[in-house]
Amino acid sequence: AAGLGTRFLPATKASPKEMLPVVDRPAIQYVVQEAVSAGLDDILMITGRSKRALEDHFDRVPDLEASLKESGKDDLLASVQQATALGELHYLRQGDPKGLGHAVLRAKTHVGDHPFAVLLGDDLIDEKEDLLTRMIAAQQKTGGSVVALMEVPREQISAYGAAAVEPVEGEEYVRVTGLVEKPSPEEAPSNLAVIGRYVLHPRIFEVLEQTPPGRGGEIQLTDAMQTLGQAEGEGAGMYGVVFKGRRFDTGDKLS
């Protein structure tokens, strides 16, 4: 949640893009709820400057709660309290905006030696879907790392990372044999796009530490995953779960 939200200026000039409302709650709340629904209750949010509103949203406001209770506005009280009871939330600023890989690397101390999930705030997944639960199960079974994949029209693949895959007999997940960041339609290995959900083995941290800046001078998570996918030993291997449900891109005004 450390991006600048430039595509939604001027609305995001003084308010984080993650706090833009989707129906009756900010976009970031849907993402946190998705994590909690998948059994994840220790959540670290990587933020940036001018993003204090994210912390405030998930904090309690006793005066507001008392006022709603006294006014008999029980439905509103319940909706306010829901955001403050979603799990154990922690916050860490990214500092230098050096890309997604750098943001993930900032979580190293908090995560330690455990597999962990990365959920990008730009992607909202229908709450009726069990994508993250399926990804966690695939990670536990393979011992590697798992990315979420979604079919897109080939002419749109240049907006995503594209995956080369091969089937795994008897399993619903696939083996990812290669990743290409934002390829042209002609160079893309498939029309399977990487979307903003990852379940990663902690070995990714040591790979990220050795990953040089790539496109745009940023540390690309895709580059590190490519390296880890071709490695051997504990934590090696890259797999994908193909998502066929509804996804909304909060970074796209027309999504």
Question: For each predicted feature, which ranges?
Answer:
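Short loop/turn motifs at secondary-structure junctions
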Residues: 39-40, 112, 141, 175
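Short, active-site-adjacent cap segments at secondary-structure transitions
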Residues: 51-54, 124-126, 247-249
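Conserved beta-loop-beta/alpha segment of the NTase-like Rossmann-fold superfamily
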Residues: 63-67, 74-165, 200-202, 208-211
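Active-site metal-binding loops of divalent metal-dependent hydrolases
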Residues: 4, 123, 253
